Amino acid sequence: MSKLRGPDGRIPDRLPDGRPAVSWERRWTEGTLPLWLVATAGGIAVIFVLGIFFYGSYTGVGSA
């Protein structure tokens, strides 16, 4: 087991000398999806759902 890991296997927030264990640049980006990708996928999903509603309003039961 690594010296940096605690007894439960987690990496501590700070090193013994007080410095952060993970740099702030990597803390918020490592292992995450970019926000622009999440927003793009969400926007496409919203447009798709609205398209289904508009399609349904012109066809089917409510089309007059």
Curated annotation (Swiss-Prot):
InterPro entries in UniProt: PSII_PsbJ, PSII_PsbJ_sf
Stretches the record annotates as Disordered: 1-20
This protein's UniProt keywords: Membrane, Photosynthesis, Photosystem II, Reaction center, Thylakoid, Transmembrane, Transmembrane helix
Transmembrane segments annotated in the record for this chain: 35-55
GO cellular component: photosystem II reaction center; plasma membrane-derived thylakoid membrane
Pfam families to which the protein is assigned, alphabetical: PsbJ
Bilayer topology: Single-pass membrane protein
Location in the cell: Cellular thylakoid membrane
Residue spans of biased composition, Basic and acidic residues class: 1-17
Taxonomy, superkingdom: Bacteria
GO biological process: photosynthesis
PANTHER family for this protein: PHOTOSYSTEM II REACTION CENTER PROTEIN J
Similarity comment text for this entry: Belongs to the PsbJ family.
Subunit structure: PSII is composed of 1 copy each of membrane proteins PsbA, PsbB, PsbC, PsbD, PsbE, PsbF, PsbH, PsbI, PsbJ, PsbK, PsbL, PsbM, PsbT, PsbX, PsbY, Psb30/Ycf12, peripheral proteins PsbO, CyanoQ (PsbQ), PsbU, PsbV and a large number of cofactors. It forms dimeric complexes.
NCBIfam families the record matches: PRK02565.1
Its job: One of the components of the core complex of photosystem II (PSII). PSII is a light-driven water:plastoquinone oxidoreductase that uses light energy to abstract electrons from H(2)O, generating O(2) and a proton gradient subsequently used for ATP formation. It consists of a core antenna complex that captures photons, and an electron transfer chain that converts photonic excitation into a charge separation.
Record's protein name: Photosystem II reaction center protein J
Species in which this protein is naturally found: Prochlorococcus marinus (strain MIT 9211)
